[in-house]
């Protein structure tokens, strides 16, 4: 029954239109046809295994955008069964299969990852698979999946810490564990080397510095981003998230007090805490998908608290939440906003999807990061696209704001502010926009 539900879920997501809604997804699509980190095809660190997967799919579909989205969908469709199997193995309770499976499937994060066109879903599947293989003592498979995790999404190196520790702790099997990791790593290094050579490492240093100091929006560089994380936790995990975090932190004490037969070492809780700190200080709170690792592992660990009589209650709740997540297929907010902007705007100022909008629309697009250029474009009648409501002080005239709702709660929505000026001679908005466009072109 769970397998049939999983197939229905997969079929539902396949009905959504293929659409790239971020610069990162566009970069991956470019990488399908030409790989170069220096050309942002894709951006650093290159994600070699994800490029291999998308190129393999592209042999069948001959459409880079579709190949990228299907690769994300394929990996994300494995998250629910792998998380459920890991919970069953860790807690030695087969009855946890249905509640964990349904709960992960019902998370707004799961379809968001599936349709993102990014490497998060496949990398998380490799991560859960490596942890599960270690519990089953399939050491070589665990090493292979861990190597693929790092090749799919090298920025997930923090996720590799626990499986690496557990694998190296296995006496007599370390070579079988390390060899696949080394082979995948060497193959990945040769792949990026043949494209960019030594310049790859220079780009890596530049990109990493920029992520943590300038445009990455991380709390490591901007302490106020921790408040943004609090809002993101509220939106994605309900305001009860402090209780959930507290429960995870006291998990080792609970196991000891109950003499749980399948008690986990405190290392698992410590590992989850490390992932939490890495998320808070190294990731962007504007992208809720960065909560996926701690959310998935948190569900697996908290499953042990679930009383046996409550398992089917959680399963039914998961089904109900899955019904709430269901929505009719439609393009993402970025695509909808771009279509309206092309009809109503002479130009556009935004900090989101700048490269995507420049390549997929005919509009002049100004990067909002450059304040002077943005102010000049806005003074000439450009529209403003933002993930936050646009204050009147940000615009040089009265505007009409349009809200584009996300398809899922973990996707970003967008605001588009369109100037509604009248010229002194009573000309229409359309004529004024045409005049503003002519001035900008000149």
Question: For the regions a protein language model found, what residue spans apply to each?
Answer:
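Short acidic/glycine- and proline-prone juxtamembrane loop motifs at membrane-interface regions
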Residues: 44, 112-122, 287-288
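Membrane-embedded, lumen/periplasm-facing catalytic core of multi-pass transferases
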Residues: 314-382
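Transmembrane-helix motifs of polytopic, lipid-linked glycan transferases
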Residues: 70-92, 125, 129, 249-255
